[in-house]
């Protein structure tokens, strides 16, 4: 299981607005400290996390944060409507559209996904594969 994801940023206030628009509606708790931004899903005592923590901070080496080519972080939403809502909220919070929410021929029929770039250029996917919702084949 992946325990956490760290995303580099050169502009933490812009990154804060972007990631809060996506992660708070998905149930993540937020805190801000000396090192940067922390988004953590609450975990009941005695249980294991169901998704990784997300940290957004300036790179430790002091060099500028750059987006990795081919690297992407995907966040699962419970419904297709939530994917659309989160995609819109992320655009309003400074994200760039990387592909409107919808089905893609290259993926399974029930995989509904939208793509974005955060304010630092990192690629983000928002997806739902809820079997109770329409698929590409419906």
Language-model segments: residues:
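Core segments of cupin and vicinal oxygen chelate
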Residues: 7-51
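Short glycine-enriched loop/turn motifs at secondary-structure junctions
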Residues: 1, 66-69, 108
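Long, continuous compositionally biased terminal/linker segments
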Residues: 41-85
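Vicinal oxygen chelate
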Residues: 10-14, 74-114, 119
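N-terminal beta-strand motif that seeds the catalytic metal site of vicinal oxygen chelate
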Residues: 1-17, 73, 129-138
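Long, contiguous binding/interaction regions
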Residues: 22-30, 36, 52-53, 63, ...
């Amino acid at each position: 299981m992946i325990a956490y994801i760290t995303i580099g940023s050169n502009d933490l206030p812009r990154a804060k607005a972007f990631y809060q628009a996506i992660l708070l509606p998905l149930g993540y708790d937020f805190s801000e400290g000396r090192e940067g931004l922390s988004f953590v899903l609450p975990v009941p005592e005695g249980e294991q996390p169901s998704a990784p923590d997300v940290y957004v901070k300036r790179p430790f080496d002091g060099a500028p944060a750059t987006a990795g080519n081919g690297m992407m972080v995907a966040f699962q939403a419970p419904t297709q409507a939530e994917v659309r809502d989160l995609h819109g909220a992320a655009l309003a919070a400074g994200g760039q559209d990387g592909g409107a929410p919808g089905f893609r021929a290259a993926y399974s029929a029930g995989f509904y996904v939208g793509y974005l770039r955060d304010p630092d250029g990192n690629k983000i996917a928002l997806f739902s594969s809820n079997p109770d919702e329409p698929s590409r084949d419906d």
